[in-house]
Amino acid sequence: MYAIVRSYSGDGASELFDQLEQRNDEIKELIGGVPGFVSYTAFRSDDGGGSTVTVCRDKTGTDESSRRAAEWVKANISATANPPATTEGGTVAHFSS
């Protein structure tokens, strides 16, 4: 499996996470529809920004999730959101309850 963490800060980050929270079903359909999708988590950070974590079966899936996320942010966030800092790589462990 492959994971990507997208971390948002600065202009537009707070609005972005407000929208993610309010439009949860839309995000679930958008990112959950990526081929090879495994899981998605979004969380706010203490500094007013936040991060998302997407896990897919392979890098092709995480690349597609990033493309979809960027398009969604561009179309739905009125403030100019800074591009996210990203960290990605192959997973060494993944589990859930």
What are these regions (language model features)?
Residues 1-51, 57-71, 77-97:
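Short S/T/G/P-rich N-terminal loop/turn motif that feeds into the first structured element of a domain
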